[in-house]
């Protein structure tokens, strides 16, 4: 069997795994016992989260990214999740979330992804253990329309910490570059924007509304057949803002490995737990590929570009973001 073996168009770049690659990739995936005997740094652990979480060292992770099953009935290539009542879903979250929080360092950060249906349950459970700093809304621009409802094109990402007066947040590492539609000049000179032969652009501070990130699709080399894969660009913002090089990024629902791949590309360590062996192999191949390909689509020379600017990024005729002091210890936003 070839993993991800479907009939695909010639230009389709979705990840596949050949039969010959499986032994090599399997050696990159740890079982529960292997991981616990040799350490968790830079590991993919193929196990049920509840079977292994107690053995993960407490306070080991500087950043935790959580993309759990939403409260929807879905088949993850043989591993199914069934929708339940809101109360039952909250109890499901508590079963593992409290334990996951124990793995967060005292000045660490946790992000959790959710959709409109489960996000209120997530907010409630997160607040029982951590302090919520903000909610990011990601406009993912994908999803089927409906005749009797609005198309679901948004997801939430909850931003939470243990200590509101002591957590790392580097906003200068996640600046965004956008086209200037109505450029303003002061004495004939561009004001707060750059004028280039490829267009007018402004480097700005990011907000909590993200509309510059596409869901992975068939022409992107990061794409897999995972039904709910998150984009590398999305996780790159979280990793760059809330961790330092050499920090450990922990993902208890690794899926096809986006958090681990991004961590490696950005010189962080990773640890991920995933129950589906096939997904673990996809993650392993993506990590192997990242040894020679560090590109994160939409992130170029230390700045995040808006959609549909790839050709301009490659031309490189623009100003890089100014060099700024990147150490930021944030006060509470709610005091």
Regions found by a protein language model. Give the residues of each.
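Core catalytic lobe of class I
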Residues: 1-24, 31-282, 328-335
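S-adenosyl-L-methionine
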Residues: 21-54, 284-325
């Amino acid at each position: 069997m070839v993993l991800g073996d479907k009939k695909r168009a010639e230009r389709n770049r979705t990840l596949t795994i050949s039969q010959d690659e499986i032994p090599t990739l399997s050696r990159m995936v740890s079982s529960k016992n292997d991981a616990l005997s040799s350490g968790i740094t830079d590991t993919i652990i193929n196990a049920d989260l509840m079977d292994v979480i107690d053995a993960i060292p407490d306070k080991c992770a500087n950043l935790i990214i959580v993309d759990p099953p939403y409260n929807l009935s879905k088949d993850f290539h043989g591993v199914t999740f069934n929708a339940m009542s809101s109360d039952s879903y909250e109890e499901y979250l508590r079963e593992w979330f409290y334990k996951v929080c124990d793995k967060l360092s005292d000045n660490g950060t946790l992000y959790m992804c959710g959709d409109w249906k489960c996000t209120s349950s997530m907010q409630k459970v997160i607040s029982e253990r951590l302090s919520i700093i903000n909610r990011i809304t990601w406009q993912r621009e994908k999803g089927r329309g409906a005749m009797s409802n609005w198309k679901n094109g948004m997801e939430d990402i909850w931003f939470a910490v243990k200590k509101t007066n002591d957590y790392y947040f580097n906003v200068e590492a996640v600046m965004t570059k956008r086209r200037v539609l109505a450029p303003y000049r002061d004495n004939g000179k561009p004001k707060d924007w750059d004028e280039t032969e490829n267009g007018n652009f402004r480097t700005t501070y990011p907000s909590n509304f993200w509309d510059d990130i596409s869901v992975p699709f068939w022409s992107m080399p990061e794409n897999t057949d995972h039904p709910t894969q998150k984009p590398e660009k999305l996780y790159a913002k979280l990793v760059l803002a809330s961790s330092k090089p050499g920090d450990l990024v922990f993902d208890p629902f690794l899926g096809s490995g986006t958090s681990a791949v991004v961590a490696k590309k950005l010189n962080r360590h990773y640890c991920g737990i995933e129950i589906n062996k096939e997904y673990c192999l996809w993650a392993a191949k993506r990590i192997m590929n990242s040894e020679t390909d560090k590109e994160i689509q939409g992130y170029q020379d230390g700045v995040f570009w808006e959609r549909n600017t790839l050709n301009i990024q490659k031309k490189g005729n623009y100003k890089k973001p100014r060099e700024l002091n990147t150490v930021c210890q944030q006060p509470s936003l709610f005091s």
